[in-house]
């Protein structure tokens, strides 16, 4: 079964149930969806073993924000087991003070529920929180939640309406800590 990039781009920042719904609608068959997801999971799990790399500037940015007294939490559409495994592999999991994952919410990104829950768990109002995102769905989620959104696009460029809702769009995580501090 073929799957094109445009379809894959719809998955970015989405929870597994949302991805499965998108696939069901696209293929019109839950059996095909299950087969596509099973193959995707095999490929992804193999890639994680051999190709998982930390995004340049991520560790430095987190360390700088922690040193400056910021609370650093994680809000990811991934399942907790996946996020924990991947972040432990790159030495970052223990740096996050709170973790909110896809299975913690009913509605995944672009719905604001994930960021609203992450803010609540951290003990801050959304307008006190900075969200760092690399996808359209994540940015929309953070913007709609009322957070300050800092975008560092990764795979797909952000549409202008999303860019307009962000505090700033950066080319690299190396510039992120300074941008966050400038808003404080």
Predicted regions and their residues:
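Metal-dependent phosphoesterase signature
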Residues: 2-3, 7, 22-60, 68-70
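Short, flexible loop segments at the rims of nucleotide/cofactor-binding pockets, characterized by
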Residues: 49-53, 77, 146-147
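Asp-based, Mg2+/Mn2+-dependent phosphohydrolase catalytic module
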Residues: 63-66, 79-184
């Amino acid at each position: 079964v073929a799957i094109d990039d445009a379809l894959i781009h719809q998955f970015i920042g989405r929870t597994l149930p949302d991805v499965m719904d998108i696939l069901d609608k696209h293929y019109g068959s839950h059996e095909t969806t299950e087969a596509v997801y099973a193959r995707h999971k095999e490929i992804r799990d193999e890639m994680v073993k051999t190709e998982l790399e930390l995004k340049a500037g991520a560790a430095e940015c987190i360390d700088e924000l922690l040193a400056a007294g910021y609370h650093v939490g994680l809000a990811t559409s991934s399942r907790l087991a996946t996020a924990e495994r991947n972040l432990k592999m790159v030495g970052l999991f223990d740096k996050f003070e709170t973790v909110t994952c896809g299975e913690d919410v009913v509605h995944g990104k672009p719905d604001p529920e994930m960021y609203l829950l992450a803010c609540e768990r951290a003990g801050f109002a959304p307008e006190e929180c900075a969200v760092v995102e690399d996808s359209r769905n994540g940015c929309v989620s953070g913007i709609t939640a009322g957070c300050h959104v800092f975008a560092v696009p990764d795979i797909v460029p952000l549409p202008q309406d999303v860019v307009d809702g962000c505090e700033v769009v950066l080319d690299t995580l190396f510039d992120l800590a300074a941008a966050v501090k400038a808003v404080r």
